[in-house]
Every structure is written in structure tokens, then in C-alpha cells.
Amino acid sequence: MVLLGRAAETKRLDALVARVQERGGALAVRGAAGIGKSALVAHAVARASAAGLRVLTTTGVECETHLPYAGLQQLLYPIRADVELIAPRQQEALRTALSGADSAAPDVFLVALAVLNLVAEAAERAPVLLVAEDSHWLDPSTSHVLGFVARRLESEPIVLLATARDGASSWLDDAELPELALSPLSGAAAEALLRRHAPDLEPASRARLLAEAAGNPLALTELPRAAADSARGGAALPSWLPLTVRLERAFTARLSDLPPATRTLLQVAALNDSVSLAETAAAARSVSGDRAGTADPAGTADLEPAVAAGLIDVDRGELRFRHPLMRSAIHQSMTRPERHAAHRALAGVLDGQADRRVWHRAAATSLPDESVASELQAAAVRAERRGGIGAAVAALDHAARLSEDPSLRADRLLRAAHLAVELGSREVVTQLLDEAAQLDLSAQQRARVVWLRGSFDEGLHSRSTDTRDLAGLAERVAAAGDRDLAVRILWSAAQRCFWSEPGAGTRLYVVSVAEGLALDDHDPWLLAILAYAAPVERGAVVIERLGRLVPSQGHDARTDRLLGTGALMVGSFDLARRFSGAAVTGLRVQGRLGLLARSLGATAWSAAQLGDLSAAIPAAEESCRLGHETTQPYLYALIRSIEAVIGALRGDPDRVRELTAEAERVGLAIAARPVLARAQLARGMAALGGGLFGEAFSHLRRLHDPVDPCFELALRCYTVGDLVDAAVHCGRDGEVRDVMREMEAAGLRTPSPALHAGLRFARALLAEDSRAEELFLTALNADLTSWPFIRARTQLAYGEWLRRQRRAADSRGHLRAARETFDALGTRPWSDRARQELRASGESSGRRGPDARDRLTPQELQIAQMAAEGLTNREIGQKLYLSHRTVSSHLHRIFPKLGITSRSGLGPALGTGP
């Protein structure tokens, strides 16, 4: 049947289905209740089926939102046997998520990758249409998975169609998908639809109903029936009520004409979180007292009046309401005793389904009941084990409400808040902690409240005194015997020392508390806390201990991540890269994309500081993308500022301006010093590379001013060489003597490789001619094996100095070496400077042509690098959370960009092969 008034909408859906073989995608359909979303979906399903597509559907139901992966189970049921085709670790994650198998809790993103690959395998046989109706009622775990999948369909023969009601929050809000917003029908279409369903209406009644329906298709089909009922003596629906309420009342009014047994069945069905007719019939018999089922064992006869009235559909043992408003109308019309009776009856027929059973028990319970609360807590544990963190939060929250013991109630609220922090649900965390704070808490519970309140935004919105207070709290908690909690609290305090500047006294207090916890000398938490709180004062201790440790190569990713970030803070970028790289390996396997984004950011920053742009570019891009996807806005801003620094090193001033502006929109609003400092560094390095030395000095000088919002304690130590380079070239070297004295003093306290490499470079630049050569040679004779960028910059500066001393022949070897290194690293501005100096020395030097870093996008570069290492498309896809088909599509675009025809040409094209 043609959908009246929806020609443009159906055309768009038809095009989406028709081009699925060439290009996949997703579309969000939004609109008011009854506006025709389901009708459009039915049209798309019919077209897809006729075109040979496999159709997989799921529908959100309000009473299922607490069941982890309930929507996903429905969606994947027809292709469940294909799970054997995906990678073993993904198989395990998906089976654990869907069945609650006794296994380690899978990360939701690993489950999502498994789903993407499972559906992609199905699409190898026939293109797939995924349908998610009423997305606003899907459980949180399913929502996370669908959001992940929807963003990765462009290269797949898969289309995802999702619907959501206007004004209802859902995963579509953050998915950034193309949208189809349904408006009311035009006047002509509305009149045609009304004539189709009520051809005999009088003109006056027709005009009134058209005005009241306001172009809503469901209203145009249901309000005439309500009008007919009122004409037979029923109460008319007030025209001033909102349309949705009037429709619900219209459905409710139709219930009164049904037999009592039918009404009972519909009431139970409205509260059932399953479409199983057998469950509904058994529970309805329990409510009515006919437990033996002597009247109508299957319930089918009692349902016939509801089917005839157009309220429900019954097919193959499944009962479905024709529209969600019918379900909500029945629910709203029930009294509390009726709802409790229906829930108790449903709980009674769900033996062997512990999670569903306890939620029905809970819904039938108004007063505190520890037995139900304990069952809900057990359900939370099961949900968490399956990766259903949102469901676990809901179960613990409800368990707290039903707890008889106030202390248990507090523990459950605090555990729920802790899990909600993992989800990034700030409002939920605040609500749970506010409830907990009203109870008579123990000292430890109060400490957990304080700690959890500061878990968002790295303490950016707190006062500077809060860092000291947090350290004091950790000290008291440790004294009370809970060292693990004390460490977590102290780690929060240490992170605040990075994101803000609490002052030297507070930093050293954090150190004092940490060193008083009697942790093992090589404990990763201790080393990370010391590095964040006192990168100079405890730099020697951290670097010495880090040097004794070996990365786990993915076996202990959390430890590797902590050690990698600690190494960053103390300026040991070579160690940072080693530990962070190991963390990336482990976190990829585990599917922990939130932490993976952070470790990739650390990898990008360390690689950029070492000058390895081939590693820094893709790591930063992936970190930024995952930071956005996992809702980490401050990390996203930080990585944007790091990308700006990379842009400066590549010689792309337009990109630097774009990225610094984006980073500072967040950084300035929250006074995030690391973001502002790196944005300023990017500006300074862009100017330095472009030969604008005075401008570079002005930008870089701000990093060393303690009252400037761009001041960051650790970063200033590792940029002293940049500042002096700019100062010397613009004749302002006298203005950096004070900074040099401070940095020399810092160098006496820490063996930081970055600080000492910068100091050696700076000393040579500032030296009188009589000492300059000695200091340049000292700088070059240091072990800079892992630091090619600073070595090449020193060679460039030495060559410049030699040429100014009229030793052109001596300068050329250093200038050539610098040029070759800069070319290899991709730091074009410094390559150009080396070429200029070579030409000034009397040696010609042609311009470097573009390489793979210039021709490929960051993600293409990353895929090309992995393929050059010998990884298969499937292996690359598993690492990057893409399907193998998407990887293949990328490679087909990469080959012509690099002028090659096969994978064997990747190594030479990237400069990594023979």
C-alpha cells in the first residue's frame, strides 16, 4: 500500500536500500508518536526483502531497558550460528554478553566489534538491513553496540535503519548519523488518509478531526473510531489534551469493550518484557485464579477480541501490540494493585530466568525487602560480568531503594555510582551520590563519595585547595586500613596536578602521602603518582625505577598504561613510547576503547616529541576519534592540541590554526593547562619552523611564565631548547637567561632525557663563539639514538654556526645529516631550513617531494603500515575495530595514491622496505 504524503521519505529509503552493494550506511528516523515511523520502516523492509536483502530487526521495549543486551539478542538471533566465523576472542565476548557465560567481563566495544564482524559475515552472502525500532527504549548495552556499528558501515553492504520518538533521549543523539525527520502530513495527504479509514464521515466531523489530528497518521486512523464510540454514548475526548494523551485515552476506552479475561491478558502483556504468548497466558491465568488453564490454556480464544479490535497481533506464539502507545495506555490505566499482581504472576512463571524474574519481583514490591534487594544485587553482578554496566547500575540503584539496612543501601548506591563513572554518566553519578550523602555514612563511605564526585573532568572544575583535601582524605583512608581506596583517591589528586596547577606545597604533600603508603618501590600506581605530582623533584626516582621494568607486551595493559604516562611526565619519551605501545597492544585485544584512546594519545605525544611523525600522525588521529566516540571531551581537546603540534612539525600552519582554535574552545572554558600549553607550543613551533622567530619567542615564552594559563610544570622543562632557539634567532637571548638558570637547577634534580637534551642544545646556542663548538660536540656526542629530531636540530644549529664562522666545508656534513633526518621524519620546515643552509654554504639541495605521510589520511597511513608489516585484512580490522571489508576498501584507495598495485609495494613506498 502506498504511504500517503511520504513520497520524498520513501524515495530516500529506497535509494538507501538500492545502493547497499556499493555503499552501506545508517539513517535515523525521528518523529512524534504516531507520525508514521513504523510504516516507513515496514516499507523499507518490504523493499529490502524484495531486493534480496537479509533483514534483522529489534524493537526497544520500555520494560526491557534493564536487561543487558536484550535488544541485541533479538537482533542477532537469526544469525546466531554464524558466530563461529568470527575471531575466537570476539566469539567469547559475544557469547558472554548474550548468554551470561561464566567468563571475564567483556568490554562493550569488543562486543560491538564482534557484532560488526558477525553481521559483516552474514552480508558476505546477502546484503543486510538492520532495523532498530523505538531506539529510545533499547537497553544501554545494545545502544552502545549499535552506535559503534552504525559509524562503521560505509564500506559494508549493510544498512542500519533506526527510529526514535521526538524528545526521547537515545543512542542516536550522539551517533551523528544522517537523519530523516518526519513532519505531519500535508492537508491533502491527511484528508486522503482520513477518507481511506473513515469514508462516511460528515463534512463537519471530518473538518474537526482533521484539525485535531494535525497531520498525525495514527490520530487520523484512531480518532475517528473514538469519535464513533462517543457518538454511541461514550465520553468524548477533550480537544485540549495533548495528542499523545488523547490517543492513549482512545486506546484505553477501547479496552472497556473487551471481555474481562481479554483485558487481563492485555494487562499482563503490557508489563511482560517478552513477546512470549505462553508466558503471558500462564501469568494471566495466575492473576485470574485459573492456574490450571482449564478455560483457555493457550490464551488464544481470549485474545481474539483484542486482535479483532486491532490492538494486537498474534503470530507464531508471539504477542505484539500494534503500537507502543497501546502498551503505555494499558499500563497507565492499571491500578497499582493490578500492576503488582501482574508482575508477581510474571515472576512466578519465569523459573530459570533469574534476571527477568527479579525485576518483576522488584516491580511488585513497594516496601524495603532485603531478599529482593539481594537478588537485584546478584543480577547487577551478572550484568557487569556480561559487560552490561548500564544494567548493573540500574539493578544496584533499585536494590538500594529496597534495602532494609541503611549501610547496605549506601554500599549499593556507591557501587552504582562507581559503575556510572565508567559509563561517563555524570547526572546519574550526581543523583546516586546525593542520595547516598543523605544517609548516615561511615568514614570510608564518605571518602568514596568525595572521591567519586571528583572522578569527572580530572578535577578541572574544582578549587586548587581540593587537591590538597583529596590527598588528606587519602591519608586518612589509608590510616583506617583501606590502602587500595587510598591509592585510587591519591591518583585522582595526582591527575589534578597535571590538569591544573595546585602549587609546590600541595604537589609535595601528594608525594608525601604516596610515599607513606608503604607500597612496593616499583608499584605502577606509586610511580605514576610521583611522576604526575612531582616530575622534577621525583624524576630521578621514577626514571631509575622505570628503567628496571619491562613492558608486559599486552599482558598487563593497565600497568603498562600507568608506567607509560608516568614516563611522559618525567620527560623519558623513549620509555613512554615503549610502555604506551605495549598498553595499546593489550587494550586493543581487550576492547577497552576508553583507555585505548588515552594510551594512543600518550603514544602520539611521545612519538611527536621524538620526531617520529609516521607513528605520531595515525596514533593521534585514532586517539582523537576514539576519545570522541567514548565521550571524553577533555581528552579529545588535549589530543587536538597534540595534533596541532604535529601539524607545526609538518609545516602546516593552516592546520595548526584550525586545531588550536578547536582545542582552545574547550581548554579556555575549563582552564585546562595541558590543552592550552600544547596549543601554545603548536603556535610557537609553527612560527619557529616558518622562520618567524620573534613570533615564536612570544608564543613559547608564555610556557615558562607561572602566572600564565599556558604554564605547565612538566612541559616547560621539555621545551627549553625551543625557547632558546627562537630567542637566539631573534636577538632576544638575554631574555632567557633566567629561564636557563631555573632549568639548569631542575637538571641537577632530575636526569630527565628530554630536559637534558634540551639543555645541551640550548647551552650550545647561547655560548660565546669560543665555547660553542665544544658544547655542540658535547650535545652531539650524547646518546641520542632514540631522539633523532633533537639530534638533527643540533646538527642543523652546529652547521649554521660553522657556516657563520666561514667554515662552509665543515658545515656541509652536519647540514646534510640534518636534512636527511628531517626528510625521514617528515618535519618539512626543518628540512627546508637545512636546505637553505646547504645552499648558502655553496651546495645545491633539491626540494623533497611528498611522501606517504603527505598523500594518505592518518587512518590510511596506519592501515598501510600494518599491511606492510604483514598483517592480514582481518588482523588489521581486529586491531582498528573495523571489518576486514572496510580495511580492503581502504587499501584499494591507498594503492593508487602511493603509485603501487599490490601489498608488496607498501614497504618501499613507506620507506620501511627494500
Predicted regions and their residues:
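N-terminal pre-P-loop "Q-motif" helix
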Residues: V2-L16
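Alpha-solenoid helical repeat architecture
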Residues: G24, L67, V314-R316, Q353-R357, ...
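Conserved phosphate-binding/catalytic loops and adjacent sensor/switch elements of nucleotide-binding enzymes
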Residues: L40-P127, W137
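Internal alpha-solenoid helical repeat scaffolds
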Residues: A46-A51, W171, P203, D290-A301, ...
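Short secondary-structure boundary elements
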Residues: Q74, A189-R401, A727-G734, K897
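Sensor-1/coupling segment of RecA-like P-loop NTPase cores
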Residues: V145-E179
